[in-house]
From Swiss-Prot:
Keyword vocabulary terms for this entry: Chloroplast, mRNA processing, Plastid, RNA-binding, tRNA processing
Annotated protein name in UniProt: Maturase K
The encoding gene: matK
Presence of keyword Transmembrane: no
InterPro entries documented for this protein: Domain_X, Maturase_MatK, Maturase_MatK_N
GO biological process: mRNA processing; RNA splicing; tRNA processing
Family, similarity comment: Belongs to the intron maturase 2 family. MatK subfamily.
One Gene Ontology molecular-function label: RNA binding
Species assigned in the record: Encephalartos altensteinii (Altenstein's bread tree)
Chloroplast as UniProt keyword: yes
Principal location: plastid
UniProt-annotated location(s): Plastid, Chloroplast
């Protein structure tokens, strides 16, 4: 694998034809175990781990010898019988086999992505989810329509094998992958871990996530060449200035130029700007044009997916929203474009007059109703927003109770600090403060008034003074309530909104915290 990485810059086909022998190398399973098992160990309690789930080269040697006895087939070990594997449980052998099978196709793909990332800027804020919103804030107000795309569900395992042929030319590896995929036809359904339909609950998730990410990359890569060709086509891009708006309306986007020999050609002055953002299985395409142009893009995307993957992507998975009339949900926000009217005084040499200037403004709003629903799902309040005490936390110390409520509040506020309206966040803070006081009152068997006198009016005391000062300044009346702040450190999923998505069955993307 080190040799493959040293020669990865060449990316010759020879490097992709000898991947199957890696399945018989002991180091591959050690790397897969260290990469996957140790990563997930911090999220699993110690009581759930088994003493047999420890890596052993002796176990790997037995596994490789059994694979050789099966004529190189690894499928029998995916659903092997526990009685035939004395001393080790079935799940551990399945973990090793699927971990090794996942590590093999990752070799050429990781080499390619590694060298592509080396050519990028060292600025690391691109990992933040909030880095999407400044782009949308600058570009979406100049767009007319939004294509809200859900990546089509995978229907047949042979589609994945055919897409892997472009990067992996090792036939035995492809045959092994095909055997496992046909053995588990429901291996991959969605990128959401909670919606994965798996035959074995735990050991297939890593392979499923890898296959889904590769499948989503293939769906996305089909559109990039088309957008580049459209962008570099014979068009005259322009910037829309306010004082030139009547001029653009008069020419109706088309100008006829007469050349010699009286030949005329049409030059489109429409702005071919296409802005694209993606998160998990959802993609957003912002277009500047008419409704007919948006319908054409939906038709072409559907046809490209149909011809490339030999499946029928449902057209209803591509929604067309008009920004002037509708809002759309993305990454835990309700996004829309609203008209902003400003009074402007125009002064001329002889006279001056006052007129109204209408501009478009990006308007992200925190979905307060959905956030209250997620808190109700987690038993912090009822469906109407009335606070409820957390009786399950009464066995914790006072500091632990305060710390848990404080982290929930800071995560919600930190993520939705880009909201144009902060009134909903005031309500969320009120809802969380009362359950905190009620929980402490139930623990000490006292009244809420006594708890407030003991801990003060500010119950959330576990945050650092710098963070409390930042939150206080953000909510200060002297600051503009419409000021938006986008943070570059939000990279992890907050499970609070995941429960909200399950309950309301809406396409609301998960909330993120630091």
């Amino acid at each position: 694998m080190d040799k493959l990485q040293r020669d990865g810059k060449e990316d010759t086909p020879r490097q992709r034809r000898f991947l199957y022998p890696l399945l018989f190398q002991e180091d591959l399973y050690a790397i897969a175990y260290d990469h996957y098992f140790n990563r997930s160990s911090s999220f699993e309690p110690m009581e759930n781990s088994s003493s047999n789930d420890r890596f052993s080269f002796l176990t790997v040697k037995r596994l490789i010898s059994r694979i050789r006895q099966q004529n190189g087939s690894i499928v029998p070990f995916v659903n092997c019988d526990q009685t035939k594997l004395v001393g080790h449980n079935r799940s551990f052998y399945s973990e090793l086999v699927l971990g090794g099978l996942t590590a093999v196709p990752e070799v050429p793909l990781s080499i390619r992505s590694k060298h592509s990332l080396e050519r990028m800027n060292e600025w690391t804020s691109f990992r933040s989810i909030h880095s999407i919103f400044p782009l949308m804030e600058d570009k979406i107000p100049h767009s007319n329509f939004i294509l809200d795309i859900r990546i089509p569900h995978l229907t047949h395992p042979e589609i994945l094998v055919r897409t892997f042929r472009r990067w992996i030319q090792d036939a035995p590896s492809l045959h092994s992958l095909r055997s496992v995929l046909h053995e588990h036809r429901n291996l991959i359904i969605s990128s959401n871990l909670d919606q994965l339909i798996l035959i074995a609950s735990k050991e297939n998730t890593r392979l499923s996530l890898f296959l889904w990410n590769y499948y989503a990359y293939e769906c996305e890569s089909l559109l990039v060449p088309l957008w580049k060709r459209f962008f570099y086509s014979r068009s005259l891009p322009y910037e829309s200035f306010i004082e030139r708006t009547p001029f653009y309306r008069k020419i109706e986007h088309i100008v006829i130029f007469y050349h010699k020999y009286l030949k005329k050609s049409l030059w489109f002055l429409k702005d071919p700007s296409i802005h694209y953002v993606k998160h998990r299985e959802r993609s957003i395409i912002a277009l500047r044009g008419t409704y007919l142009l948006a319908k054409k893009w939906r038709y072409h995307i559907t046809k490209f997916w149909q011809c490339h993957f030999h499946l029928w992507p449902q057209p209803y998975r591509i929604y067309i929203d008009e920004l002037s009339n509708n809002c759309f949900s993305f990454l835990g926000y309700l996004l829309s474009v609203k008209m902003k009217t400003s009074v402007v005084r125009i002064k001329m040499p002889d006279d001056s007059f006052i007129t109204d200037l209408i501009t478009k403004e990006f308007d992200p709003i925190a979905p307060t109703t959905l956030l209250i629903g997620s808190l109700a799902k987690e038993k912090f309040c009822d469906i109407s927003g009335h606070p409820i005490s957390r009786l399950a936390w009464t066995g914790l110390t006072d500091d632990d109770i305060l710390d848990r409520f404080d982290r929930i509040w800071r995560n919600i506020f930190h993520y939705h600090s880009g909201s144009s309206k902060k009134d909903g966040l005031y309500r969320m803070k009120y809802i969380l403060r009362l359950p905190c006081a009620k929980t402490l009152a139930c623990k000490h068997k006292s009244a809420i008034r006594v708890v407030r006198e003991r801990f003060g009016s500010e119950l959330f005391t576990k945050s650092s003074p710098k963070e409390r000062e930042s939150i206080f300044l953000s909510f200060s009346k002297t600051r503009s309530q419409r000021e938006r702040i986008w943070h570059s450190d939000i990279i992890q999923i907050n499970p609070l909104i995941n429960s909200c998505r399950k309950k309301h069955n809406l396409q609301i993307e998960p909330l993120f915290d630091r």
